Amino acid sequence: MTTPVSFHPQAFIELALSRGVLKFGEFTLKSGRVSPYFFNAGLLNDGEALSLLAQGYADKLTQCENVDVIFGPAYKGIPFVAATAVALSQTHNKSVPWGFNRKEAKDHGEGGILVGAAVEGKKVWIIDDVITAGTAIREVVTILKNAGATIAGVLVALDRQERGQGELSAIQEVQKELEIPVHALITMKDLMDYLEAKGEKEALANMQAYREKYGI
């Protein structure tokens, strides 16, 4: 068996670029802002890419406290949390229960909206790709709390490090409102450091201008 490689931001950025997960250019976001980059974790759709992402989540979780259960919000978070559970077992010798939610509750079989490990009385870490407005995270936090869970924190792939409607970023708003930590594998600063190291002056200048306008 090949030993998984530890997560490094630069290696992940390069893989994301090669898969089209990360693109530099000009992209209009739902907010109406014109961003100099775009990140779509849904394109991490092969074994190598998913494995590297999961390794990043697993490495980060070993530095966190209160990891009773890991949880992936439907739908994108489901493969992320499953792969992370495997990475925790294979590379850190930690067997961590995992679960996810359905978009709609079942009224037959085992029923309900939650699938996988029981969360009642457990400290749960939520794993997702990004927090854009924070709406989806707030919804899943409510679901988990209603099931008796304590939210230990949130782990995302990318922190855009930009303001929401106010002076705080979406991640900062979630941290303040829900009083939980939110950690990211890579940040906008990591992307800028990568561009600087590669000598991509135009893309870096566009990122710097965007950060000056919207950054935190």
Swiss-Prot record:
GO terms for biological process: 'de novo' pyrimidine nucleobase biosynthetic process; 'de novo' UMP biosynthetic process; pyrimidine ribonucleoside biosynthetic process. It is an enzyme of class 2 (transferase). Keywords: Glycosyltransferase, Magnesium, Pyrimidine biosynthesis, Transferase. It catalyses: orotidine 5'-phosphate + diphosphate = orotate + 5-phospho-alpha-D-ribose 1-diphosphate. Pathway: Pyrimidine metabolism; UMP biosynthesis via de novo pathway; UMP from orotate: step 1/2. It holds the Pfam family Pribosyltran. The keyword Lipid metabolism does not apply. Its cofactor is Mg(2+). Its EC number is 2.4.2.10. Orotate binds at F38, F39, T132, R160. One of its GO terms (cellular component) is cytoplasm. The keyword Glycosyltransferase applies. GO terms for molecular function: magnesium ion binding; orotate phosphoribosyltransferase activity. 5-phospho-alpha-D-ribose 1-diphosphate binds at residues 30, 75-76, 102-103, 106, 108, 128-136. NCBIfam families: pyrE (TIGR00336). Catalyzes the transfer of a ribosyl phosphate group from 5-phosphoribose 1-diphosphate to orotate, leading to the formation of orotidine monophosphate (OMP). Belongs to the purine/pyrimidine phosphoribosyltransferase family. PyrE subfamily. Homodimer. This is Orotate phosphoribosyltransferase. It comes from Acinetobacter baumannii (strain AB307-0294).
